[in-house]
């Protein structure tokens, strides 16, 4: 059985958080963000779940915990299941702030998340390219590392397991 709250935290911080690494490591992602004229931020606020703000500039992407009051685009989400549906592409997010900047979501943000999907769910053929294989490995490592942290912090069994691990 899937714990939708734990999955939402994993999707927020591990999956969307990997956009930071993608924008730093991948030439195609760098090309996508190179068109950004001034920094733009997108905040996701999940009721009874995670909230974070992603800020994009031509120099990269940064994720901050919580909703920045001065974010350009705010996307409130009713619950963790809806947020997981957004990540799966089954639910369409509706911004309550920044409707004039929706073009960023439809073009740049979508292009970045499509590229992230391409990197994280590669074809066998793509993995034959050593540079792509390296990018996939680095992004996967980052995603898994953060996912483990979220599971340890959010999931009941994960919390129990984490509590039995000696610090250090």
Which role does the model predict for each range below?
Residues 1-167:
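Feature captures hydrophobic
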